């Protein structure tokens, strides 16, 4: 049985008829079974490789099939601009099975945040800092808000791994698990990383649940182009570099 066949019938229908896809990409198909089984997953694919759908489609199936209620999935990104870009797409996907996706970050107005608290969507796109603000608030019932939380997707997880903001994210995830009263499924999305197993172990934190790296497309990535040029001296190297991209910013 393919991963696609494991999806909720409503999700299957809209993948074919609303999105018009002839099939799923290898990453998307391979990620379905472990995500449906509740495993922690690190999904790796090149840019525009369908990572968002690899996480969201099986999670929508879990919400619809397992009867999750209230806020069930957090979709965490490092940048507000990325959240703003993703929100309409996730709203559309959630609507395939009668669900909703909301947006919460520092630029979202108070009235919109109040509506989310009053009627939580099944999926919430947000940042680590916004999650901490909710947890720290004394004016909101964060325990009730996160009571039904089941899974967290961390997009661009390599941008968090190992630095101060990443450790802050892990602390927030551990606190969310404590508030929800369950081990939250963690799904990381990333492009190429040097040590995927290490990044997965970092993301999983204190959880002992099964975990795996899903990266069927990475072996076919094009090798980087490398050109060697002998410049003779450090001074000459500086001159050559300065002329390569005159007037443009470059990281050397």
Spans of model-derived segments:
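Walker A/P-loop NTP-binding motif
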Residues: 33-41, 53-68, 89-91, 174-177
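Pre-Walker A (Motif I) flank of P-loop NTPase domains
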Residues: 37-43, 70-73, 121-122, 185, ...
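Conserved SF1/SF2 helicase motif Ia
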Residues: 49, 61-86, 179-183
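Conserved helix-turn-beta segment of the N-terminal RecA-like "Helicase ATP-binding" lobe
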Residues: 82-105, 202-208
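Conserved motor-coupling elements within RecA-like helicase/translocase cores
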Residues: 109-124
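SF2 helicase catalytic motif II
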Residues: 129-182
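Conserved interdomain linker/interface between the two RecA-like ATPase lobes of SF2 helicase motors
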Residues: 174, 185-252
């Amino acid at each position: 049985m393919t991963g696609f066949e494991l999806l909720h019938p409503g999700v299957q229908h809209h993948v074919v008829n609303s999105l018009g896809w002839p099939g799923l990409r290898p990453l998307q198909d391979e990620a379905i079974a472990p995500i449906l089984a509740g495993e922690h997953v690190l999904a790796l694919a090149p840019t525009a490789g369908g990572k968002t759908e690899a996480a969201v489609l099986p999670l929508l199936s879990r919400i619809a099939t397992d009867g999750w209620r209230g806020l069930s999935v957090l979709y965490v990104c490092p940048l507000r601009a990325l959240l703003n870009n993703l929100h309409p797409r996730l709203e559309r996907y959630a609507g395939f099975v009668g669900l909703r996706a909301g947006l919460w970050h520092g630029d979202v107005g108070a009235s919109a945040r109040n509506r989310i608290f009053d009627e939580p969507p099944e999926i919430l796109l947000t940042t680590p800092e916004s999650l901490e603000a909710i947890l720290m608030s004394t004016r909101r019932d964060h325990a009730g808000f996160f009571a039904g939380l089941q899974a967290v997707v961390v997009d661009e997880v390599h941008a968090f791994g190992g630095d101060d903001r990443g450790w802050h994210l892990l602390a927030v995830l551990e606190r969310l698990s404590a508030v929800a009263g369950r081990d939250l499924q963690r799904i990381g999305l990333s492009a190429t990383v040097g040590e995927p197993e290490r990044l997965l172990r970092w993301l999983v934190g204190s959880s002992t649940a099964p975990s795996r790296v899903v990266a069927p497309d990475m072996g076919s990535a094009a090798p980087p182009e490398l050109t060697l040029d002998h410049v003779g001296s450090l001074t000459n190297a500086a001159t050559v570099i300065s002329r390569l991209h005159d007037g443009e910013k470059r990281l050397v």
